[in-house]
Amino acid sequence: MTFTLGMVGAGQFASHFAVLFDKHPGISTLYATDVIPERAQQLVDELDLAGTFPSFEDMLASPDVDAVAIFTQRWTHGPLVLQALQAGKHVYSAVPMATAQTEIESIIQAVQETGLTYMMGETSQYNPATVFARKKAEQGAFGRVFYAEGDYVHDMDLGFYDAYKYSGGDDWKATASYPPMWYPTHAIGGVLGAVPRHATSVSCIGVHDDRGDGVFDTAVSMFDNDYSNMTALFELDGGGSMRINEFRRVGFPSYIRESRFRWFGTDGSFEQLVTNSVWQDRDGVTDVSDQIANRPTMDEDDPRLADVSPALRSSFVSGHAPVHDDLTGRLPAEFDFAPNGHEGSHQLLVDDFVTAVNDGVLPPVNAWQAARYTLPGLIAFESAKRDGARLTIPDQGDAPVAVGERLPAADRVS
Protein backbone atom coordinates (compact mmCIF):
# COMPACT_ATOMS: atom_id res chain seq x y z
CA MET A 1 0.00 0.00 0.00
CA THR A 2 1.39 3.40 -0.98
CA PHE A 3 0.37 7.04 -1.35
CA THR A 4 1.58 10.14 -3.16
CA LEU A 5 3.09 13.13 -1.36
CA GLY A 6 3.68 16.78 -2.15
CA MET A 7 6.54 18.70 -0.51
CA VAL A 8 5.37 22.21 0.39
CA GLY A 9 8.56 24.23 0.67
CA ALA A 10 11.89 23.14 -0.78
CA GLY A 11 14.39 24.90 1.46
CA GLN A 12 17.25 23.63 3.59
CA PHE A 13 15.21 21.59 6.06
CA ALA A 14 12.72 20.25 3.52
CA SER A 15 15.33 18.88 1.16
CA HIS A 16 16.73 16.53 3.81
CA PHE A 17 13.30 15.11 4.53
CA ALA A 18 12.53 14.84 0.82
CA VAL A 19 15.37 12.33 0.48
CA LEU A 20 13.75 10.10 3.11
CA PHE A 21 10.21 10.46 1.80
CA ASP A 22 11.52 9.57 -1.65
CA LYS A 23 13.32 6.48 -0.36
CA HIS A 24 10.42 5.16 1.73
CA PRO A 25 8.65 2.29 -0.06
CA GLY A 26 5.33 3.43 1.39
CA ILE A 27 5.35 6.52 -0.83
CA SER A 28 4.94 5.95 -4.55
CA THR A 29 5.39 9.45 -5.95
CA LEU A 30 6.84 12.71 -4.67
CA TYR A 31 6.16 16.24 -5.93
CA ALA A 32 7.35 19.68 -4.79
CA THR A 33 6.21 23.29 -4.72
CA ASP A 34 7.79 26.45 -3.35
CA VAL A 35 7.08 30.18 -3.50
CA ILE A 36 10.53 30.35 -5.11
CA PRO A 37 9.90 28.01 -8.06
CA GLU A 38 13.60 27.52 -8.76
CA ARG A 39 14.06 25.81 -5.40
CA ALA A 40 11.27 23.34 -6.10
CA GLN A 41 12.69 22.58 -9.53
CA GLN A 42 16.17 22.10 -8.10
CA LEU A 43 14.83 19.60 -5.57
CA VAL A 44 12.98 17.72 -8.30
CA ASP A 45 16.07 17.63 -10.48
CA GLU A 46 18.40 16.50 -7.69
CA LEU A 47 16.18 13.61 -6.57
CA ASP A 48 14.49 12.86 -9.89
CA LEU A 49 11.04 13.48 -8.43
CA ALA A 50 7.75 13.40 -10.34
CA GLY A 51 7.52 17.15 -10.88
CA THR A 52 6.55 20.53 -9.46
CA PHE A 53 3.31 22.42 -8.94
CA PRO A 54 3.18 26.17 -9.59
CA SER A 55 1.50 26.81 -6.23
CA PHE A 56 0.27 25.23 -3.02
CA GLU A 57 -3.29 25.71 -4.22
CA ASP A 58 -2.56 23.85 -7.44
CA MET A 59 -1.06 21.00 -5.45
CA LEU A 60 -4.14 20.77 -3.23
CA ALA A 61 -6.42 20.77 -6.26
CA SER A 62 -4.62 17.85 -7.86
CA PRO A 63 -6.13 14.36 -7.53
CA ASP A 64 -2.60 13.03 -8.02
CA VAL A 65 -1.56 14.15 -4.52
CA ASP A 66 -2.83 12.24 -1.47
CA ALA A 67 -0.84 14.01 1.24
CA VAL A 68 1.36 17.05 1.80
CA ALA A 69 4.44 17.69 3.93
CA ILE A 70 4.62 21.33 5.01
CA PHE A 71 8.09 22.83 5.46
CA THR A 72 7.29 26.53 5.17
CA GLN A 73 8.09 29.40 7.50
CA ARG A 74 6.96 28.60 11.00
CA TRP A 75 4.19 31.18 11.35
CA THR A 76 2.46 29.89 8.20
CA HIS A 77 1.91 26.30 9.33
CA GLY A 78 -1.50 26.63 10.97
CA PRO A 79 -3.41 28.14 8.01
CA LEU A 80 -1.68 25.89 5.47
CA VAL A 81 -2.40 22.74 7.47
CA LEU A 82 -6.06 23.66 7.80
CA GLN A 83 -6.31 24.42 4.10
CA ALA A 84 -4.78 21.05 3.23
CA LEU A 85 -7.06 19.07 5.54
CA GLN A 86 -10.10 20.83 4.13
CA ALA A 87 -8.88 19.86 0.66
CA GLY A 88 -8.83 16.21 1.70
CA LYS A 89 -5.07 15.76 2.10
CA HIS A 90 -3.21 14.01 4.89
CA VAL A 91 -0.68 16.37 6.49
CA TYR A 92 2.84 16.15 7.87
CA SER A 93 3.87 19.53 9.30
CA ALA A 94 7.16 20.84 10.57
CA VAL A 95 6.99 22.50 13.97
CA PRO A 96 5.28 24.38 15.43
CA MET A 97 1.67 23.32 14.93
CA ALA A 98 0.38 26.90 14.76
CA THR A 99 0.77 30.36 16.27
CA ALA A 100 -2.79 30.86 17.57
CA GLN A 101 -5.09 28.88 19.82
CA THR A 102 -7.91 29.18 17.28
CA GLU A 103 -5.74 27.59 14.60
CA ILE A 104 -4.94 24.65 16.87
CA GLU A 105 -8.60 24.13 17.71
CA SER A 106 -9.56 24.30 14.03
CA ILE A 107 -6.93 21.72 13.05
CA ILE A 108 -8.17 19.27 15.68
CA GLN A 109 -11.76 19.82 14.54
CA ALA A 110 -10.77 19.21 10.92
CA VAL A 111 -8.98 15.98 11.83
CA GLN A 112 -12.05 14.81 13.74
CA GLU A 113 -14.40 15.66 10.89
CA THR A 114 -12.30 14.21 8.06
CA GLY A 115 -10.53 11.27 9.68
CA LEU A 116 -7.39 12.36 7.84
CA THR A 117 -3.91 11.92 9.29
CA TYR A 118 -2.22 14.94 10.84
CA MET A 119 1.25 14.63 12.30
CA MET A 120 3.64 17.26 13.60
CA GLY A 121 7.27 16.35 13.03
CA GLU A 122 8.59 17.07 16.51
CA THR A 123 12.17 15.86 16.53
CA SER A 124 12.35 15.68 20.34
CA GLN A 125 9.94 12.75 20.24
CA TYR A 126 13.04 10.73 19.33
CA ASN A 127 15.70 12.78 21.07
CA PRO A 128 17.87 10.12 22.75
CA ALA A 129 17.34 11.68 26.17
CA THR A 130 13.57 11.59 25.68
CA VAL A 131 13.69 7.99 24.44
CA PHE A 132 15.81 7.01 27.46
CA ALA A 133 13.49 8.79 29.90
CA ARG A 134 10.38 7.39 28.23
CA LYS A 135 11.69 3.86 28.76
CA LYS A 136 12.49 4.61 32.40
CA ALA A 137 9.03 6.10 32.90
CA GLU A 138 7.36 3.05 31.35
CA GLN A 139 9.38 0.84 33.70
CA GLY A 140 8.26 2.94 36.68
CA ALA A 141 11.88 3.76 37.53
CA PHE A 142 11.17 7.46 38.12
CA GLY A 143 8.36 6.79 40.57
CA ARG A 144 6.16 9.87 40.43
CA VAL A 145 7.71 12.57 38.23
CA PHE A 146 7.09 15.86 40.02
CA TYR A 147 9.51 18.20 38.22
CA ALA A 148 11.10 18.40 34.78
CA GLU A 149 13.10 20.83 32.67
CA GLY A 150 13.45 21.30 28.94
CA ASP A 151 15.81 23.80 27.35
CA TYR A 152 16.05 24.80 23.71
CA VAL A 153 19.29 26.76 23.81
CA HIS A 154 20.20 28.10 20.38
CA ASP A 155 22.19 31.30 20.06
CA MET A 156 21.31 33.46 17.07
CA ASP A 157 24.99 33.82 16.16
CA LEU A 158 25.29 30.06 15.69
CA GLY A 159 23.58 29.72 12.34
CA PHE A 160 20.21 31.36 12.93
CA TYR A 161 21.14 34.64 11.24
CA ASP A 162 22.09 32.67 8.12
CA ALA A 163 18.91 30.58 8.28
CA TYR A 164 16.63 33.59 8.59
CA LYS A 165 18.41 35.36 5.74
CA TYR A 166 17.95 32.27 3.56
CA SER A 167 14.23 31.99 4.29
CA GLY A 168 13.29 35.62 4.87
CA GLY A 169 14.89 37.45 1.97
CA ASP A 170 15.41 41.19 2.18
CA ASP A 171 13.00 41.54 5.12
CA TRP A 172 14.60 38.77 7.17
CA LYS A 173 15.00 40.90 10.30
CA ALA A 174 11.24 41.28 10.59
CA THR A 175 10.86 37.52 10.88
CA ALA A 176 14.05 36.75 12.83
CA SER A 177 12.29 38.24 15.86
CA TYR A 178 10.01 35.21 16.03
CA PRO A 179 9.00 34.93 19.72
CA PRO A 180 11.05 32.22 21.45
CA MET A 181 7.99 30.81 23.24
CA TRP A 182 6.21 30.43 19.91
CA TYR A 183 8.83 27.78 19.13
CA PRO A 184 8.44 25.70 22.29
CA THR A 185 7.96 22.21 20.94
CA HIS A 186 11.55 20.97 21.08
CA ALA A 187 11.73 21.73 24.80
CA ILE A 188 8.15 20.91 25.81
CA GLY A 189 7.93 17.95 23.45
CA GLY A 190 11.10 16.48 24.88
CA VAL A 191 9.75 16.62 28.42
CA LEU A 192 6.18 15.53 27.73
CA GLY A 193 7.29 13.01 25.11
CA ALA A 194 8.71 11.01 28.00
CA VAL A 195 5.95 11.42 30.59
CA PRO A 196 2.24 11.48 29.64
CA ARG A 197 1.30 14.79 31.22
CA HIS A 198 0.14 18.20 30.03
CA ALA A 199 0.53 21.79 31.19
CA THR A 200 -2.39 23.48 32.94
CA SER A 201 -1.05 26.94 33.81
CA VAL A 202 2.03 29.08 33.24
CA SER A 203 3.97 32.11 34.43
CA CYS A 204 6.63 33.36 32.03
CA ILE A 205 9.36 35.99 32.11
CA GLY A 206 10.91 37.45 28.97
CA VAL A 207 14.24 39.26 28.64
CA HIS A 208 14.15 42.30 26.37
CA ASP A 209 16.92 42.13 23.78
CA ASP A 210 19.66 44.77 23.91
CA ARG A 211 21.89 43.80 20.94
CA GLY A 212 20.59 46.74 18.92
CA ASP A 213 21.05 45.11 15.52
CA GLY A 214 17.45 45.31 14.34
CA VAL A 215 16.61 41.75 15.38
CA PHE A 216 14.19 41.41 18.31
CA ASP A 217 13.28 45.06 17.76
CA THR A 218 9.59 45.97 18.02
CA ALA A 219 10.09 48.71 15.45
CA VAL A 220 11.00 46.04 12.91
CA SER A 221 9.41 42.83 14.20
CA MET A 222 6.31 41.56 12.39
CA PHE A 223 5.44 39.89 15.71
CA ASP A 224 5.92 43.03 17.84
CA ASN A 225 8.45 41.04 19.85
CA ASP A 226 11.68 42.11 21.52
CA TYR A 227 12.16 39.12 23.84
CA SER A 228 15.23 37.10 22.89
CA ASN A 229 15.33 34.89 26.00
CA MET A 230 12.31 33.50 27.85
CA THR A 231 11.77 31.26 30.88
CA ALA A 232 8.42 29.72 31.80
CA LEU A 233 7.26 27.72 34.80
CA PHE A 234 4.33 25.44 34.01
CA GLU A 235 2.00 23.60 36.35
CA LEU A 236 1.31 20.04 35.19
CA ASP A 237 -1.89 18.06 35.49
CA GLY A 238 -1.90 15.80 38.51
CA GLY A 239 0.58 18.03 40.32
CA GLY A 240 4.18 18.95 39.72
CA SER A 241 5.86 21.49 37.48
CA MET A 242 7.94 21.91 34.34
CA ARG A 243 10.40 24.68 33.58
CA ILE A 244 11.06 25.56 29.94
CA ASN A 245 13.87 27.80 28.68
CA GLU A 246 13.90 29.27 25.16
CA PHE A 247 17.19 31.14 24.70
CA ARG A 248 18.41 32.95 21.55
CA ARG A 249 21.19 35.09 23.07
CA VAL A 250 23.33 32.74 25.10
CA GLY A 251 26.94 31.67 25.48
CA PHE A 252 26.35 27.99 24.81
CA PRO A 253 27.63 25.52 22.16
CA SER A 254 24.28 24.68 20.58
CA TYR A 255 26.08 22.92 17.73
CA ILE A 256 26.98 20.21 20.27
CA ARG A 257 23.58 19.99 21.97
CA GLU A 258 20.77 22.47 21.44
CA SER A 259 18.14 20.68 23.53
CA ARG A 260 18.76 19.32 27.02
CA PHE A 261 16.47 17.82 29.63
CA ARG A 262 16.03 16.87 33.30
CA TRP A 263 13.36 14.77 35.01
CA PHE A 264 13.05 14.32 38.79
CA GLY A 265 10.91 11.59 40.32
CA THR A 266 10.33 10.19 43.76
CA ASP A 267 12.48 7.14 42.94
CA GLY A 268 14.88 8.24 40.21
CA SER A 269 16.08 11.18 38.15
CA PHE A 270 17.87 12.03 34.92
CA GLU A 271 20.08 15.05 34.25
CA GLN A 272 21.79 16.22 31.09
CA LEU A 273 24.51 18.76 30.31
CA VAL A 274 26.26 19.48 27.01
CA THR A 275 28.48 16.41 26.88
CA ASN A 276 27.25 14.10 29.62
CA SER A 277 24.02 12.56 30.89
CA VAL A 278 23.39 10.70 34.14
CA TRP A 279 20.74 8.48 35.70
CA GLN A 280 20.47 8.83 39.48
CA ASP A 281 18.61 7.05 42.25
CA ARG A 282 19.16 6.41 45.93
CA ASP A 283 21.84 3.85 45.12
CA GLY A 284 24.06 6.28 43.23
CA VAL A 285 24.85 7.80 39.85
CA THR A 286 25.20 6.02 36.50
CA ASP A 287 26.76 7.80 33.53
CA VAL A 288 24.54 6.98 30.52
CA SER A 289 26.20 9.35 28.06
CA ASP A 290 27.24 6.51 25.75
CA GLN A 291 23.65 5.28 25.45
CA ILE A 292 22.44 8.60 24.05
CA ALA A 293 25.46 9.53 21.94
CA ASN A 294 24.50 9.84 18.26
CA ARG A 295 26.40 8.15 15.46
CA PRO A 296 26.94 10.45 12.44
CA THR A 297 25.45 9.56 9.05
CA MET A 298 27.59 11.91 6.96
CA ASP A 299 30.47 14.36 7.28
CA GLU A 300 29.72 18.00 8.00
CA ASP A 301 31.58 18.97 4.81
CA ASP A 302 29.32 16.75 2.68
CA PRO A 303 28.30 18.59 -0.54
CA ARG A 304 24.64 18.02 0.35
CA LEU A 305 25.11 20.48 3.22
CA ALA A 306 26.59 23.24 1.08
CA ASP A 307 23.59 25.56 1.60
CA VAL A 308 23.47 24.97 5.37
CA SER A 309 25.36 27.24 7.76
CA PRO A 310 28.39 25.40 9.24
CA ALA A 311 27.02 26.11 12.72
CA LEU A 312 23.81 24.22 11.88
CA ARG A 313 25.26 21.21 10.08
CA SER A 314 25.53 19.02 13.16
CA SER A 315 21.71 18.91 13.23
CA PHE A 316 21.67 17.31 9.78
CA VAL A 317 24.33 14.63 10.27
CA SER A 318 23.40 13.04 13.61
CA GLY A 319 22.18 9.47 13.30
CA HIS A 320 20.80 6.97 15.74
CA ALA A 321 22.12 6.45 19.26
CA PRO A 322 22.34 3.08 21.04
CA VAL A 323 19.11 3.91 22.87
CA HIS A 324 17.36 3.92 19.48
CA ASP A 325 18.44 0.39 18.60
CA ASP A 326 15.17 -1.28 19.58
CA LEU A 327 13.22 1.27 17.52
CA THR A 328 15.07 1.08 14.22
CA GLY A 329 14.12 -2.48 13.29
CA ARG A 330 10.86 -1.18 11.82
CA LEU A 331 12.63 1.12 9.37
CA PRO A 332 12.72 0.10 5.69
CA ALA A 333 15.94 -1.29 4.25
CA GLU A 334 15.99 1.69 1.90
CA PHE A 335 17.00 3.83 4.89
CA ASP A 336 20.23 1.91 5.37
CA PHE A 337 23.08 4.42 4.91
CA ALA A 338 20.53 7.21 4.25
CA PRO A 339 20.98 10.59 5.94
CA ASN A 340 19.32 11.26 9.26
CA GLY A 341 19.35 14.29 11.53
CA HIS A 342 18.29 16.08 14.71
CA GLU A 343 19.72 13.42 16.99
CA GLY A 344 18.49 10.47 14.96
CA SER A 345 14.85 11.54 14.65
CA HIS A 346 14.29 12.18 10.94
CA GLN A 347 14.03 8.58 9.76
CA LEU A 348 11.74 7.57 12.61
CA LEU A 349 9.43 10.55 12.06
CA VAL A 350 9.12 9.85 8.35
CA ASP A 351 8.29 6.22 9.05
CA ASP A 352 5.71 7.26 11.68
CA PHE A 353 3.87 9.37 9.12
CA VAL A 354 4.01 6.85 6.29
CA THR A 355 2.74 4.11 8.59
CA ALA A 356 -0.05 6.32 9.94
CA VAL A 357 -1.33 7.19 6.47
CA ASN A 358 -1.04 3.73 4.94
CA ASP A 359 -2.47 1.85 7.93
CA GLY A 360 -4.99 4.51 8.97
CA VAL A 361 -3.65 4.65 12.52
CA LEU A 362 -2.92 7.46 14.97
CA PRO A 363 0.72 8.66 14.88
CA PRO A 364 2.61 9.46 18.11
CA VAL A 365 2.71 13.24 17.57
CA ASN A 366 -0.90 13.53 16.47
CA ALA A 367 -3.03 16.68 16.54
CA TRP A 368 -3.93 16.33 20.22
CA GLN A 369 -0.33 15.70 21.28
CA ALA A 370 0.94 18.48 19.02
CA ALA A 371 -1.47 20.86 20.75
CA ARG A 372 -0.01 19.91 24.13
CA TYR A 373 3.49 20.61 22.80
CA THR A 374 2.55 23.94 21.17
CA LEU A 375 -0.25 25.78 22.95
CA PRO A 376 1.54 26.09 26.33
CA GLY A 377 4.23 28.19 24.64
CA LEU A 378 1.67 30.49 23.04
CA ILE A 379 0.05 31.10 26.42
CA ALA A 380 3.49 31.59 27.99
CA PHE A 381 4.23 34.41 25.54
CA GLU A 382 0.99 36.12 26.61
CA SER A 383 2.03 35.68 30.25
CA ALA A 384 5.37 37.38 29.60
CA LYS A 385 3.61 40.34 27.98
CA ARG A 386 1.53 40.61 31.16
CA ASP A 387 4.57 40.75 33.46
CA GLY A 388 4.53 37.06 34.28
CA ALA A 389 0.85 36.76 35.16
CA ARG A 390 -0.16 33.17 35.83
CA LEU A 391 -2.48 32.10 33.02
CA THR A 392 -4.58 29.00 32.50
CA ILE A 393 -3.72 26.76 29.55
CA PRO A 394 -6.76 25.25 27.80
CA ASP A 395 -6.36 21.55 27.06
CA GLN A 396 -7.80 19.99 23.92
CA GLY A 397 -8.12 16.60 25.57
CA ASP A 398 -6.84 13.17 24.62
CA ALA A 399 -6.97 11.72 21.13
CA PRO A 400 -10.05 9.53 20.48
CA VAL A 401 -7.91 6.40 20.09
CA ALA A 402 -4.51 5.28 21.34
CA VAL A 403 -1.34 5.71 19.29
CA GLY A 404 -1.15 2.95 16.71
CA GLU A 405 -4.88 2.25 16.74
CA ARG A 406 -7.13 2.86 13.74
CA LEU A 407 -8.71 6.27 13.45
CA PRO A 408 -12.50 6.63 13.43
CA ALA A 409 -14.10 5.87 10.06
CA ALA A 410 -13.93 8.64 7.45
CA ASP A 411 -13.26 9.08 3.75
CA ARG A 412 -9.63 8.15 4.13
CA VAL A 413 -7.10 7.94 1.32
CA SER A 414 -5.42 4.54 1.48
How should these model regions be labeled?
Residues M1-L47:
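N-terminal Rossmann-like dinucleotide-binding module
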Residues S28-T29, E334-A338, T355-Y373:
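Glycine- and charged-residue-rich phosphate/anionic-cofactor binding loop of Rossmann-like
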Residues S62, D66-A67, Q73-R74, G78-Y126, ...:
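Beta-strand-loop-alpha-helix segment that lines the small-molecule cofactor/substrate pocket
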Residues L116, G143-Y147, K173, S383-S414:
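C-terminal capping/lid region of NAD(P)-dependent oxidoreductase domains
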Residues S124-N225:
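Predominantly a Rossmann-like dinucleotide-binding segment in NAD(P)-dependent oxidoreductases
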Residues W182-D307, P339, H346-P363, G377-F381, ...:
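Contiguous beta-strand/loop segments that form the cofactor/metal-binding neighborhood of enzyme cores
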